[in-house]
Regions:
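N-terminal helix-turn-helix/winged-helix DNA-binding helices
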Residues: 1-3, 41-79, 87-90, 98-99, ...
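Flexible loop/hinge segments that line or gate small-molecule binding clefts
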Residues: 91, 99, 117-166, 187, ...
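Hydrophobic alpha-helical segments within soluble ligand-binding/sensing domains
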Residues: 156-181, 196, 200, 221-230, ...
Length: 322
């Protein structure tokens, strides 16, 4: 585990200079700042953001890393964390990663450098090993929608596989046998888990899995619309569609409407997440509820408590969608 002395030695500066760089002091030259940052990157040194934040009582901040704050799902998550931050006298800093490993890493590092008292992280592309390294150095780092081995007590996750199984079972119970699945094209854990949940439900009911009915698309309205167009172009008759999330379901409804297909009389559609958009769709969308507000609230409270060395509040480490 690298120390501040190791950084100073590699950068060719004093420990005091490294400390000034970490605290964004104006009394450092640009050459020193670059040398220190290069050494930190090479050594994978992550200063203990929690200890630094506690030494700056007037600068209490909470950080969150999300995929894309402009989407309804992540917008709800950020708002829930922000409400906890405000209630506890913290200011919220947000980092977007766009489901890219390099940007996830950079977002976490930037929040650490900004002396966050705790960090809630939604990161699907970084490896378990890299996240374990971060969590070992940052006691106030909490994962959401992912479980990192060895740090299960600091992870707030959802049973995505069960949720997709629940959605598929809902259509099967309505009598559907030819059911398509609109899958996320992002290579992330919950995309695989939800697709597997769909497969599980079909298998349990003796329905053959037709890979041609699993259509990938970006997890948004455009992706859902294009996926349904691709499905219709196959000429295969389906009576039900399970969607990776609600935005894809919204796009699916639009494409079906454009092609004169009535929902739910001709085809049934079910989403996943239960975000605000579902309240304004016509016809109304049946969806699986993702308790994102509860999960984000618990994650934020846990991060703050751990950052300050306080007893961890009671949390649910694995939520069950309904």
């Amino acid at each position: 585990m690298a120390t501040i002395k190791d950084v100073a030695r590699l950068a060719g500066v004093s420990v005091a200079t490294v400390s000034r760089v970490l605290n964004s002091s104006p009394k450092t030259s640009s050459e020193s700042r670059e040398a220190v940052k290069k050494a930190m990157d090479e050594l994978k040194y992550h200063p203990n953001a929690n200890a630094r934040a506690l030494s700056h009582q007037g600068n209490e901040t909470l950080g969150i890393v999300v995929g894309d704050v402009s989407t309804p799902f992540f917008g709800i998550m950020v708002k829930a964390v922000d409400q906890v931050a405000y209630a506890t006298g913290n200011f919220l800093l947000v980092g977007n990663s766009y489901h890219d490993a390099k940007r996830e890493r950079k977002a976490i590092e930037q929040l650490l450098r900004h002396q966050c008292a705790g960090i809630v992280v939604h990161a699907m592309m970084l490896s378990d090993e890299e996240l374990q390294h971060f969590m070992a150095h940052v006691p106030g780092m909490v994962m959401i929608n992912r479980t990192v081995p060895g740090y299960e007590s600091r992870c707030i996750n959802l049973d995505n596989r069960f949720g997709a199984e629940l959605a598929t079972n809902h259509l099967i119970q309505q009598g559907h046998r030819s059911i398509a699945y609109l899958s996320s094209s992002y290579q992330i854990a919950d995309a695989f888990e939800r697709q597997q949940g769909y497969i599980d439900a079909l298998t349990q009911h003796g329905i053959p899995v037709d890979e041609r009915l699993i259509i990938q698309g970006t997890p948004d309205e455009i992706g859902g619309e294009r996926a349904v167009v691709g499905l219709l172009n196959q000429g295969r008759k389906v009576t039900g569609i399970v969607c990776y999330n609600d935005p894809m379901a919204a796009g699916a409804l639009s494409a079906l409407s454009d092609n004169g297909i009535q929902v739910p009389t001709q085809i049934s559609v079910i989403g996943f997440d239960d975000v605000l958009i579902t309240n304004y769709l016509q016809p109304h969308l049946t969806t699986i509820r993702y308790p994102v507000i509860e999960m984000a609230t618990q994650a934020a409270r846990l991060a703050i408590a751990l950052a300050h060395g306080e007893p961890a509040p009671d949390v649910t480490n694995l939520f069950i969608p309904t």
